[in-house]
């Protein structure tokens, strides 16, 4: 199989499907399925077979015509692409309702990816405490100092949109290179920093639109 690392030119739609592919091949290996094909993959994850083959072609020869794909090989391949074996520490900014839920979220496919620090304003009674599994919740005034002393390069933002950019600016100065952003605002960051935004309101509105279209 060709050894091929993803480049910055990898289509975003393809990149978003990588975790699906990894999760599927991981599950198939656990079910003792040794080989599969694009049609069966399509049925499992709801992506058409042509798209799957096109995605896979971006990485070289992942399978053989008439033979299909070896599940263990592709589990390991996509796992490596996604950094499954790397220890990833994350800072959570904002411990409101959503933030508290995220603190207790189990990253099922990546047990080496975990939140190790959380932050909020001094008015939050949780500041100065820690979760049951030992995650400290700091005052946001300590954010830059603490992150600089840590190995954290990734942050989750669960703050009000009017505060989000200021928090991001502070974290970029502290060395953060990637953000998962739940604030409904477009963040300005340097070219070497990655932002993945999730707008829950927009996602729900899109869902309702498609539900309405189904009823017509």
Swiss-Prot record:
Q: From which residue to which does any coiled coil extend?
A: none
One MF term from GO for this chain?
A: DNA binding
Q: How does it assemble?
A: Homodimer.
Mind telling me which NCBIfam families this protein's record contains? PRK05472.1-3, PRK05472.1-5, PRK05472.2-3, PRK05472.2-4, PRK05472.2-5
Which residues make up the binding site for NAD(+)?
94-99
Q: Does the keyword Cytoplasm apply?
A: yes
Compartments where located: Cytoplasm
Which classification does the entry list for the species? Bacteria, Bacillati, Bacillota, Bacilli, Lactobacillales
Q: What are the transmembrane regions?
A: none
**Record keywords:** Cytoplasm, DNA-binding, NAD, Repressor, Transcription, Transcription regulation
Q: Which GO terms describe its biological process?
A: negative regulation of DNA-templated transcription; response to redox state
Functional summary from the UniProt entry: Modulates transcription in response to changes in cellular NADH/NAD(+) redox state.
> DNA-binding region spans which residues?
20-59
GO terms for cellular component: cytoplasm
- SMART domains assigned: CoA_binding (SM00881)
Protein family: Belongs to the transcriptional regulatory Rex family.
Q: Respond yes or no to whether keyword Cell cycle is given for this record.
A: no
Q: Identify one Pfam family in the record.
A: Put_DNA-bind_N
Q: What is this protein called?
A: Redox-sensing transcriptional repressor Rex
Which species expresses this protein natively?
Lactococcus lactis subsp. cremoris (strain MG1363)
UniProt cross-references to InterPro entries, sorted A to Z: CoA-bd, NAD(P)-bd_dom_sf, Rex_DNA-bd_C_dom, Tscrpt_rep_Rex, WH-like_DNA-bd_sf, WH_DNA-bd_sf
